[in-house]
Amino acid sequence: MEDFVRQCFNPMIVELAEKAMKEYGEDLKIETNKFAAICTHLEVCFMYSDFHFINEQGESIVVELDDPNALLKHRFEIIEGRDRTMAWTVVNSICNTTGAEKPKFLPDLYDYKENRFIEIGVTRREVHIYYLEKANKIKSENTHIHIFSFTGEEMATKADYTLDEESRARIKTRLFTIRQEMANRGLWDSFRQSERGEETIEERFEITGTMRRLADQSLPPNFSCLENFRAYVDGFEPNGCIEGKLSQMSKEVNARIEPFLKTTPRPIRLPDGPPCFQRSKFLLMDALKLSIEDPSHEGEGIPLYDAIKCMRTFFGWKEPYIVKPHEKGINPNYLLSWKQVLAELQDIENEEKIPRTKNMKKTSQLKWALGENMAPEKVDFDNCRDISDLKQYDSDEPELRSLSSWIQNEFNKACELTDSIWIELDEIGEDVAPIEYIASMRRNYFTAEVSHCRATEYIMKGVYINTALLNASCAAMDDFQLIPMISKCRTKEGRRKTNLYGFIIKGRSHLRNDTDVVNFVSMEFSLTDPRLEPHKWEKYCVLEIGDMLLRSAIGQMSRPMFLYVRTNGTSKIKMKWGMEMRRCLLQSLQQIESMIEAESSVKEKDMTKEFFENKSETWPIGESPKGVEEGSIGKVCRTLLAKSVFNSLYASPQLEGFSAESRKLLLVVQALRDNLEPGTFDLGGLYEAIEECLINDPWVLLNASWFNSFLTHALR
């Protein structure tokens, strides 16, 4: 950090900062973040003053430095950066000549035009928090406060920003540049977190020792110590604090706080249109597995060997044909692609030794399906600056889609138990430290509830597919590699099992940036007839490829076997998150843990054992049109896990927006249920922000429908 400061700031500023730290007995080799903060503050004070003069008529003017008029009177007197004695001498002199009231603390500047002292603040936290700390410390009407943040926000007394917009923009740009430079060197996080609040020196009852440490530990985020939190709370007017805050932000804002009553909220409007379609990267409830138990074949664990072994377990293959075409695709190409996979797998089996990986021949059907040579040619921007009508592609607005019942069915299925164990105990991670016995017990109970869950199967399937695809994308960039979609599990009896869901063929994958896309064709086995819900399969071409004999209570029966084929794409960053889907287990475990903690604090003893072993007790799971659904603690665990998994599988900007905006409405409704008499302003704007996210995503539409059920029952 010290090297960065010396490179980034003017030597004069660095020298002044060194003097200031020496004056306060601080070591800049140790307090490097403070060194950077002092330099930043000095530079902002100097930039605030630069180019601002007062002419003979007493008007404020902005003049560049090399202008001959620079002999005009400077508008600002700089106090910051002087040693304490000299600074107080300047302040006293100003007070004597202008009649200004002497401030309690040394300000940063004096404004000769407005006749007031100015306190400049530069914060890495929220501007309003820092503003209130400053105001509480100064406790003076006569010192004007102006706060800047590294994110481009600012706040000033009575929203009077003193300088013209261009001068302030210069300061904000410089702060943003400093932040970027720090981030590039990996220094920003440490710098951001090191900011302490304003220290106020007042005589008050002292809290010391253990109580003091406990007080400091139990503060809300963004507060470094009890004093800062006190200052923040003291700065709030009990009445009208929202209006006050808004008026500080802008003179134009005039918000009327409306009471939020049971009759106030309306349901969220879901879009009309054709039903939404399946958009996950792989099939969920409709997937079919070809499996081998206790695999012990040669090359066991090598995906291609495992896949061929699984394919050999099925004998009902037949000449494939299309049963549900893709509306916009060249469907024969999908059919030819599957035939090519079968033929090339047959070729491998005829070889003496099976290779570890298989690169497909670059046939016309695969080139079409993988979008080979379809991307528009990239041209350097500098080469087309002179083109007068240069513009971005016209892109159509996405078509609005309505909620369809299949997504609720998918979710219900994800919460169900399967007859296999998908995670071992150590999937959540061993205890790193000698952690309490309680934590291990909770983890073991939770794992027992979710290890058989279908959502856990989706996690392991997602981790495998994304890992295999990312590896292939890096190792075989130019090849059309065949990637089997595999998962591993154990039967109830503990026997190992390898499952094949189908295949992926990846396209060219020169992935330089995190968001660069690799195309792939997925081919997945299923027993679901696509003609039952054709809208769900809009993006797929579905083939019938065989007949499967199934054992049932009434004997054997034959069912047609389908292959769901589609072109898809993903990116490095999406695959990276897909590989980390196990985090969903951790997230849902933490949610369960907070429920146990709440119960334990009421009973004043650890309730983990009772929580999981009392099978008669039911817990709220979620809302449905019928009301609050309840179930066993195991069902709660599996539902929370399924929600977390679906958030990962259906991650999208629509989901991000809906979650963030609907949460605001949820908090207001919760406040109403807790009889806190909440008030709102611009509720219509909040609804608009929520409904803007409801376009065509099935998971977002389902969440919006659940939210409406919650509103109905919460406000009865």
From Swiss-Prot:
Which prosthetic group or cofactor does it need? Mn(2+)
* Transmembrane segments annotated in the record for this chain: none
Look up the domain of life of the source.
Viruses
Q: Which UniProt keywords apply?
A: Cap snatching, Endonuclease, Eukaryotic host gene expression shutoff by virus, Eukaryotic host transcription shutoff by virus, Host cytoplasm, Host gene expression shutoff by virus, Host nucleus, Host-virus interaction, Hydrolase, Inhibition of host RNA polymerase II by virus, Manganese, Metal-binding, Nuclease, Phosphoprotein
Q: How is the cofactor bound?
A: Binds 2 manganese ions per subunit.
Tell me the residue numbers annotated for binding Mn(2+) 1: 41, 108, 119-120
- Predominantly, its location class is host cell
Q: How does it assemble?
A: Influenza RNA polymerase is composed of three subunits: PB1, PB2 and PA. Interacts (via C-terminus) with PB1 (via N-terminus).
Say which family it is in.
Belongs to the influenza viruses PA family.
What protein does this entry describe? Answer: Polymerase acidic protein
Identify the species of origin: Influenza A virus (strain A/Qu/7/1970 H3N2)
Gene name on record? PA
